[in-house]
Amino acid sequence: MKQIIFIFMSLLCFSCSSKAQNQTADTNVQSDKKILVAYFSCTGTTEKAADAIAKTVGGKLYHITPATANTSADLDWNNKSSRSSIEMTTENSRPELGGEALNLKDYDVIFLGYPIWWNLCPRPVNTFLEKYDFSGKTVIPFATSGGSSITNSVKQLKKLYPKIVWGESRLLNGSVKQAGDWAKGVI
């Protein structure tokens, strides 16, 4: 009797673990494209969306970081003297970047994530776009925002960088599942 119970329990465990593996595999996209998910995030909101996209499409995460990290005082958009306010009101501001260097030759598709600041992408994103050669790449913007749409920021990006091939953009203020589902649909 113990052997029958043992066999039954073993089969039950095996079938449950097999089903769990299949469910995990179904959430990921198999693509022959090499994907980078580059994002700028100061509070973690955009980072969560970027992480969900990278996990779903099998992309490498890359955090766009300024050479000097932002403090909470730097991000105080109500203070006209704050770093973010000065950067965003100075159209040609291009803050120096830190972090590891990239070889974009390794990638076909770049998801580009950022929060909406002053109805635009933050200036470090502009620095990133001007630092690297995006020839032959497709750049797919996504953003997070407390109240703005992505439309104006993408319009500005297309105007400033007309040689880049831009993919379908999306504002991702929902769940991380929404971010992953959208990413699967645009690859």
Write out the residue ranges for each language-model feature:
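Short amphipathic alpha-helical segments and helix-helix/interface helices
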Residues: 126-131, 154-158
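Bacterial Sec-dependent N-terminal signal peptides
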Residues: 1-24
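Short, glycine/serine-rich, charged loops/turns that create anion-binding
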Residues: 11-12, 42-44, 146
